Amino acid sequence: MITLRPSEARGHGKLDWLDSYFSFSFSHYYDPAHMNFSNLRVINEDYIAPGQGFATHGHKDMEIVTYVLEGELEHKDSIGNGSIIRPGDVQRMSAGTGILHSEFNPSPDQPVHLLQIWITPNQFGVEPSYEQKFFSPEDKQGQLRLVASPDGRNGSVTIHQDACIYASVLGQGETVSYSLSNRRAWLQIIRGNLTLNGKTLKTGDGAGINEEQAITCTGQGEATEFLLFDLP
């Protein structure tokens, strides 16, 4: 069964410096029908204005993944990390026993566009940690590139959950298939259009996938980018 989550049905929040679209309940947006999907708790699409960002704040017991689409994001945290996250980078922060961090757009004139992803961990009270890795467009072209996994295999970042995240870019007519067996999956379109087992999805759409043995995605345009979450 494939349940579509259209882009326009997402929650929306707007501040002077931040424009956000929520796939699941977050902040002031509450929808009991869309609290999470398996261990996937948050997919927020954020646009952060130049020279603005999230001031220092804390998290505990959450796996937080940031996927920058356009612009740059400056990260600082309480365990000594400081970095710039650019398109192609995947940032993973395990909050564990507690971590403070800030995320700031350092550009004076360019917004930053990103996906913020939260996954509920299968271990609580772990030592906070941070990881960041780059995946080129060629890594993702015409295939499912593993970018996050429980064991960090194939150069992916490591998360504390029985879940994997794949990134892909498909050209017109390019196809990728994935076997699910008895697992669930979520697909999130970043840009472009594709068909998922015959169903059409567009930019910003998501899809919850249950009780499907396999899925096939086919690009409908020059460069369709998406994330696939393999979930318990």
From Swiss-Prot:
CDD domains: cupin_Yhhw_C (cd20311), cupin_Yhhw_N (cd02910). The keyword Oxidoreductase applies. InterPro entries: Pirin, Pirin_N_dom, Quercetinase_C, RmlC-like_jellyroll, RmlC_Cupin_sf. A divalent metal cation binds at residues 57, 59, 101, 103. Pathway: Flavonoid metabolism; quercetin degradation. Its cofactor is a divalent metal cation. One of its GO terms (molecular function) is quercetin 2,3-dioxygenase activity. This is Putative quercetin 2,3-dioxygenase sll1773. It comes from Synechocystis sp. (strain ATCC 27184 / PCC 6803 / Kazusa).
